[in-house]
Amino acid sequence: MKPVRTRFAPSPTGYLHIGGARTALFSWAYARRHGGDFILRIEDTDVARSTPEAVQAILDGMQWLGLEHDEGPFYQMQRMDRYKEVIQQMLANGSAYYCYTTREELDALRAEQEAKKEKPRYDGRWRPEAGKALPVPPTDVPPVIRFKNPQGGVVAWDDQVKGRIEFANTELDDLIIARADGTPTYNFCVCVDDWDMGITHVIRGDDHVNNTPRQINILKALGAEVPTYAHLSMILGDDGAKLSKRHGAVSVMQYDEEGFLTEAVINYLARLGWSHGDDEVFSRQQFVEWFDLDHITASAAQFNTEKLLWLNQHYMKQLPPAELAAKVQARLTARGVDTANGPDLEKAVVLYVDRSNTLNVLADAVEVFYAHVTPNPELLAQHLADDARPALAEFAAGIATVTWEAPAINALIKETVTKHGLKMPKLAMPLRVILTGQAQTPAVDAVIALIGRDKVAATLAAYL
């Protein structure tokens, strides 16, 4: 059996987005599952829109996702000589030809066809045929080069996601494979690349379905083996509309910036249009072992932000505390927060991780242990009632001698509220707001224990 070779071939006209990342993941996983090779190819022939920054963004995104390639990255702009060589071979063997039809002539042809309610298409006026007399080539019109598409029969393939797909060759006109300035076109370059690189399986978005029959015909004309195709359905946003920039994250790296873990994103992407029974949470290695093309759904996948957040929290809770603390430390350092003069960050993240679904949310929560807290006056007024002030003062006095552990602090709070005839929240809520600036925290005794006796005493003194 021929070794599996897959490829991811993005165009560097923007960031690596979720759809592209899923395509890359599925292509990578299929190669890994079958012990094959995963090739990275940058399709940068759109010179006007391709940028070095976009190339770097793609490479950064692939690295962050951990989708290492075995070969590449290959750049189409560096393969121009090869494309032109193949075009000359096709001209020589009659599978391509020069076309001198001008833009004005094509526009007139289109208008005529539309007036007759016909599908606009090239009429083959420069296509060589047995017994057909061609016009004399004009000297003032630089020609394009067209592929001589078969005129009869069908082009078909068994798509691994969508099933059998057929196109009548009469629906396909003679594709331009080289522009008038000599530069080869996208569909042609893709064919030569897949041929030269020995690609066996093409996994890509279903926006390429209409390109596939053209590419198959070109590959056959080249004498190349046609790869197996799997076209992935689109991804919809939370609202059921096609996923786009307005749904939030525009690039994979934005998920990193927003505090998502790589493994959570990988796990989530894997479930976007593929399933293994009812399994929701699985490792990268388990995904590779399970992944196949048979269980990719042909219907559109719907992005669910809440599910991604749930998964992210799950993976955060699975991290060793030291590793989780290191990730939060990096975010706090970037904010200019010094954690040297506060409690053990490892203990802080363990205390708050159950309430945090991203690293950023966790960093926000624990930052109060290392920064000066100024409670919102409205929040303070809402939770610090006049009848609670004597209890607050007594608690502040009691912390000087209490054993500095959460159970002992909890006992002091209960003793104080009982003595003053109050319910627990009457004292616990103002303590939360004064010490952390937050109305919602983990157990207040655990928070107080972590902040430290001296800082708690000094902070409470300012409100008595």
UniProtKB/Swiss-Prot annotation:
GO terms for molecular function: ATP binding; glutamate-tRNA ligase activity; tRNA binding; zinc ion binding. ATP binds at K245. It comes from the Bacteria. A motif ('KMSKS' region) lies at residues 242-246. A motif ('HIGH' region) lies at residues 10-20. Keywords: Aminoacyl-tRNA synthetase, ATP-binding, Cytoplasm, Ligase, Nucleotide-binding, Protein biosynthesis. It is an enzyme of class 6 (ligase). Transmembrane segments: none annotated. Gene3D superfamilies: 1.10.10.350, HUPs. GO terms for biological process: glutamyl-tRNA aminoacylation. Residues 113-130 have a biased composition (Basic and acidic residues). It is found in: Cytoplasm. Residues 113-142 are annotated as: Disordered. GO terms for cellular component: cytosol. Its EC number is 6.1.1.17. Its main location: cytoplasm. It catalyses: tRNA(Glu) + L-glutamate + ATP = L-glutamyl-tRNA(Glu) + AMP + diphosphate. Catalyzes the attachment of glutamate to tRNA(Glu) in a two-step reaction: glutamate is first activated by ATP to form Glu-AMP and then transferred to the acceptor end of tRNA(Glu). PANTHER family: GLUTAMATE--TRNA LIGASE (PTHR43311), GLUTAMATE--TRNA LIGASE, MITOCHONDRIAL-RELATED (PTHR43311:SF2). Monomer. Belongs to the class-I aminoacyl-tRNA synthetase family. Glutamate--tRNA ligase type 1 subfamily. This is Glutamate--tRNA ligase.
